[in-house]
Each structure stands twice: as C-alpha cells, then as structure tokens.
C-alpha cells in the first residue's frame, strides 16, 4: 500500500499529518502554516482560492468566500439550524431540498462537498510537495456524532478531491490514538473535543496498544463559532441600540464583526479584558460610524450559559452509557481550539476532578491520530488495535411508524446484526425497507438514511412471509442493508448513499470537471512560478550589481555588469508584456550573465583581499581617464603594482579578467 496521510478536516481549520520513521508529525502548508483555514473562495477572475488566500478576501468578497462548510456536509436543508445559516454568504435549498451555496462571481451553485473537496485537495497537494511523491489516499476524521449521511458525504468529498478515503475515523478516537499510541499503562481516558463547529465526547480504555471506545456522544451543531456568535450579537445589539443600524444586515460588516469576535474570544483566554475596535464599519446621517468598546471575560461568560449547558449533557450521557463514574477517569484530553476558553476548562474540571492533559496540541492532535491510523493501515505500526463504536442507533420503520432498533448506539464496529420481519397486509407482494438513524421512538423523528423495496414475495396471509433484514457497519461506520425473503431466497441489498448532496451522476461529472480544472490550475501555477522565479532572479541580479560596484568600482567589471543589466532589462520587459514564451529564453540569458559576473567577483576576491580595493579601482580608473597626463604620483596605487602613470599591459593584467582577451 502506498503512502497514506492523516487529515483533520475541521470546521475552522484543517491539518494534514504523516507517519515517518514510526513517528507522526504535522506537515506545514505551502504558506508555512501548520494549520490551513477551512475557507474556499473565488477571486474576481474566477480563480479558486483555498486556505489563507481565501481567508484574506473574506471581508472584501464575503459572498464569494465560504467558511464553516463542515456544518452543511451531508445535511438536508430542513435539518439546518438558524445558527448554521448565520454566515455572510448565501445558502439555499435546491428543488430536492438539498443544500446549495451560490457563488455570484462564477455564476454557479456548489454542493458543500464540492467546496470541501477543494480543502482536501490543497492538503493533499501540500503533503505531496513535502513528501516528494504523489499522495493518493488518506485517513479523514469526522466528528464522532456524525451520522451515516454525513460520513458518506465526507467520503464523496474525498472522491471529488481525487483521493481514496481509506478510513473514516472519529475525531476523539484519533485524539486518543495520538495521546496514547506510545503508552503501555492501562488508562481510562475522556476526550473532550470542542472544535469550531462540532462537539464530541468519547470515553476510551487504553491498554498495551489496544484502544477500546466505550461510549461516545456529542452535538454536531455546537462549536467555538457559536461562542463567537454571542459576541457578534452583543456588539451588534449595542450598536443598533445606539445608532439604529443593524450591522448583521451588511455582509461586509458582519464578516468584520465575526473576525473581531473570534479575536476577542481568543484573547480573553489569556487576559481579563480586551478592546474591540472596528472603525468606519457603517455610515450614519452625520457621517461614518465606528465600534469602540471593551469586552471583559465575565461579560463574555455571562453571554454563554446555555452553550455550557449543551456541553454538559453529552458528557453526562457518555458516562452513563459507559457505566463509568467520573472518579474512574484517569486522564482528560482536550481537543479543539475552543477548549482553550477558561470557562470550558472549568466546566470540564467540575465534571471530572482532574487537570486536563497539557502534553498535546489541541489544534493538531486529531491529525496526528489520523496519521497513526494511516500507519496501522499500511502496517508501519503493528502493535496497535482500535475498536470504535457507532455513535447513533440504527433501525428501520415498522407498523405505526415506530423505530425498530437493530444496532444500538455505542455498539463496537465493525458489526453485523439481523432480525426477521413479516408483512402487515394479506397477500402483500413486496415490502419497503426504510432505514433510520437516531434515538427517538418514532421513526419520523430520526434521520432517514434511505429506503429500498424487496419484491416478489409469494401471496400469503398477513404475518406468514419471513423477511430477514441485516445491517452491516464497516470499520468506517458506513452502513449496508440487505433484505432476504426466506421462502424464495430472493435478496435485495443497498449501500446507504443518501447522505451526500450529490448523486452518482453528479459526482462523476464533477470528477471530470475537476480533472479539467486541474490541468488549468497546473498551467496557472506554472505561470505564477515562472513569474516568481523571474522576479527573484531580477532581485538577485540587482544585489550582485551593487556588490560589484562596491568591490570593483563601476569600471572594474564593466563588460559583465553591462551584460547583466541588458539581460535584466530583457526579463523585465517580458514580465511587463506578460510574454512567458520569451521569458524562459531571457531568464537563461540573465543566468548566464550572472554567472560571468559572479566568476569575476570570485576571482577578484581570491586575488586581492585588501580593504578599500573597490575605492582604489574607482579612483584609479577616473585618474586614468581624466588626469593621466597630469599626475605623476598615484597615492592609491598598490606598492607591488605596475609602474606609476601607465595602465596595465597584457603581461600585468589579471588572467581571470575577461577583458584580458579582448
């Protein structure tokens, strides 16, 4: 198996890591950062921007720049909460009730999976550049409480990015792998994962390389962004009360508010009060309006009591499902940047009387764990075993709309479970299998994953035919359902694919489009790299000319200097005219001219290291040109040089001087 990387696909930031020499480490992106903003955008020229480049245009072009995409992956429009829709760009439903994100500059609508695929593609490209080889597979992490639909959609995003998703891994489990993969002692670990847009808690038992997940719980619509939104609303409400202007109705103002709120939240983790300054954020009747205020930690915490309550309940549920008490926990691992908030850490301490582990970086630990899982898959790590669980119950709809659970939540995976059902009407020739996921008693209150029909059942009284329904969950947490008529042996099976906002034809079309776009992207990248190389070489040439003037004087290597200047002008002309075909030839000429100048400088340094030699050369050249007949003595001449009052003859010249052979 080839190289597999680990990807933490986050709501706010994403990270890629790899296992090398048995140790996992994070790969820096092309911009030098260890985390990549999970932001995708399009410039006014319709150029795709991902990561930091996209984040830079959030304020200037909020309708064409998309963040928090993870909250939309694998979800139908009717499932979205109002807090998820509080974004500066437009989110709407198509005629099938699926989420779509319009982009005005490209005049297209995108499924969330398409945009997320661009993030995955960048992470993989950066990893390929670092490793010096193509990366075609990855372990991708998802929140533990992601349902089957969201997991399928994440896998589709990987397909659109052109990689094979070898394993879908729960984020808290990945964090535990990173924390305990080199520990041999038996530990009971609580992983508290509060990211930008999702929250998970998992309880694991770690012993001698075996990781047993005992219980998991969470909230896929709760994260650090919700805390940011409380600050946004606090500022906007105060501004509206004072000036009568609702900043949330202006896309650019809303984006500025969001960035200021995130910054204030981060700063309040280390200080008790922080200033918030947003000049010229709006215009009133009397001129520009500004935001100038201070936010202290106690006020911030007073804005979020209900959010803390929502963090409390999943932890209590996970402890109850595992059968553990809080005192049974040996270690607490905090994951996600939002866990740096003091009020969150204090909440965890009230639940589990332990100081959280500080040996892991909460922003990177999930990607490191994904890299460990990649090492397990490739066989690089042979002494580790991971036993995960399914986060939500799986079942089907029975008579009266009831939910019949076949696989309860927190069942270890992979797993196969089956049960026998019958017909509800006499002479019924077919049955519909409707698969649901969730914890509610009524099927319609849960998440519908898909349905299919088993036909060809022989006529019989009600309750006589026997239909065996089997659920299979693989190690990725993905579901396959089959139904078999025991009388005829007729069988119907289906891999649940209803989670994605794209059908198979759309995925195929997008893959073809992505390949065509990849060729264009490579061409654009090549053009940019050639221009950057040219600009770098011109800057280098300018430095070498200054060095030559200082060391040799303006006439010490006149021919080489003129050659560099002419070649440099040719390159600058090509850049100005955007003539990239001629640029390569001009670059070769500049490199050749620089080689000649560098050789001349090197020879001069080797032959004479005396100080002020450049100044002596300059004054000597000026004297020869202007005062050769008037000066009898040259105060700057070297004692061992040729006779005063005349220039060097062929015998006296430096044999390394190219002018010698003219």
Curated annotation (Swiss-Prot):
What would be the name of the gene that encodes this protein?
A: dnaK1
HAMAP family xrefs: DnaK
Q: Which family does it belong to?
A: Belongs to the heat shock protein 70 family.
Q: Which InterPro entries does the entry link to?
A: ATPase_NBD, Chaperone_DnaK, Heat_shock_70_CS, HSP70_peptide-bd_sf, Hsp_70_fam
Kindly indicate whether the keyword Chaperone belongs to this entry.
yes
Q: What does this protein do?
A: Acts as a chaperone.
Protein species of origin: Parasynechococcus marenigrum (strain WH8102)
Gene Ontology molecular function, alphabetical: ATP binding; ATP-dependent protein folding chaperone; unfolded protein binding
* Domain of life, per lineage: Bacteria
Name this polypeptide is given: Chaperone protein dnaK1
Q: Segment Disordered: which positions?
A: 630-662
Which positions bear Phosphothreonine? 198
Q: Which UniProt keywords apply?
A: ATP-binding, Chaperone, Nucleotide-binding, Phosphoprotein, Stress response
Q: Which Pfam families match?
A: HSP70 (PF00012)
């Amino acid at each position: 198996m080839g190289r597999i990387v680990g990807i933490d696909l986050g709501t706010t930031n994403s990270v890629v890591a790899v296992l090398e020499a048995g140790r996992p480490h994070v790969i820096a992106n092309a911009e030098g950062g260890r985390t990549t903003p999970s932001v995708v955008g399009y410039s006014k020229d319709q150029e795709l921007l991902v990561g930091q480049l996209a984040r830079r245009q959030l304020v200037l072009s909020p309708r064409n720049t998309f963040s928090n995409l993870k909250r939309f992956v694998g979800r139908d429009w009717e499932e979205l909460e109002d807090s998820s829709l509080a974004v500066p760009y437009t989110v709407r439903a198509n005629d099938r009730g699926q989420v779509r994100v319009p982009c005005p500059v490209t005049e297209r609508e995108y499924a969330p999976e398409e945009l997320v695929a661009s993030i995955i593609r960048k992470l993989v490209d950066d990893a390929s550049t670092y490793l010096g080889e193509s990366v075609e597979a990855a372990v991708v992490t998802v929140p533990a409480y992601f349902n089957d639909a969201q997991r399928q959609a994440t896998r589709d995003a990987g397909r659109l990015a052109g990689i094979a998703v070898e394993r879908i891994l729960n984020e808290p489990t990945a964090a535990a792998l990173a924390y305990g993969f080199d520990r041999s002692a038996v530990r009971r670990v609580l992983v508290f994962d509060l990211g930008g847009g999702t929250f998970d808690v998992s309880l694991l038992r770690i012993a001698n390389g075996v990781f047993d997940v005992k219980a998991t719980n969470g909230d896929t619509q709760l994260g650090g962004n919700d805390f940011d939104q409380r600050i946004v609303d606090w500022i906007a409400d105060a501004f509206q009360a004072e000036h009568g202007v609702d900043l949330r109705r202006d896309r650019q103002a809303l984006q500025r508010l969001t960035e200021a709120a995130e910054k204030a939240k981060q700063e309040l983790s280390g200080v008790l009060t922080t200033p918030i300054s947003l000049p010229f954020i709006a215009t009133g009747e009397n001129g520009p309006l500004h935001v100038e205020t201070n936010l202290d930690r106690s006020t911030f915490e007073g804005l979020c009591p209900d959010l803390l309550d929502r963090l409390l309940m999943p932890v209590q549920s996970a402890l109850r499902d595992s059968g553990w008490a809080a005192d049974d926990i040996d270690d607490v691992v905090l994951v996600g940047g939002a866990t740096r908030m003091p009020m969150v850490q204090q909440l965890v301490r009230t639940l589990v009387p332990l100081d959280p582990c500080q040996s892991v970086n909460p922003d990177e630990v999930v990607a490191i764990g994904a890299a460990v899982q990649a090492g397990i898959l490739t066989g690089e790590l042979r002494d580790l075993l991971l036993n995960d669980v399914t986060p939500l119950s799986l079942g089907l709809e029975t008579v009266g709309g009831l939910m019949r659970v076949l696989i309860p939540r927190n069942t270890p995976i992979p797993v196969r479970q089956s049960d026998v059902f019958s017909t509800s009407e006499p002479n019924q020739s077919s049955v519909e299998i409707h698969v649901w996921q969730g914890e509610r008693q009524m099927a319609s209150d849960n998440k519908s994953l898909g349905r299919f029909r088993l036909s060809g059942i022989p006529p019989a009284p009600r309750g006589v035919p026997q239909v065996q329904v089997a659920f299979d969950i693989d190690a990725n947490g993905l579901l396959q359902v089959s139904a078999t008529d025991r009388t005829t042996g007729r069988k119907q099976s289906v891999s649940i694919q209803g989670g994605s906002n794209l059908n198979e034809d759309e995925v195929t079309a997008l893959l073809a489009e992505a390949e065509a776009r990849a060729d264009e992207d490579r061409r654009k990248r090549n053009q940019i790299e050639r221009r950057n190389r040219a600009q770098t070489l011109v800057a280098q040439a300018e430095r070498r000319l200054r060095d030559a003037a200082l060391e040799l004087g303006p006439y010490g290597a006149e021919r080489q200097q003129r050659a560099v200047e002419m070649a440099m002008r040719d390159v600058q002309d090509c850049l100005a005219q955007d003539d990239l075909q001629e640029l390569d030839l001009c670059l070769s000429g500049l490199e050749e001219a620089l080689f000649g100048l560098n050789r001349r400088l090197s020879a001069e340094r080797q032959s004479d290291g005396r100080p002020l030699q450049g100044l002596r050369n300059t004054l000597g050249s000026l004297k020869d040109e202007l005062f050769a007949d008037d000066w009898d003595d040259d105060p700057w001449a070297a004692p061992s040089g040729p006779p005063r009052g005349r220039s060097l003859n062929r015998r006296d010249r430096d044999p390394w001087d190219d002018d010698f052979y003219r």
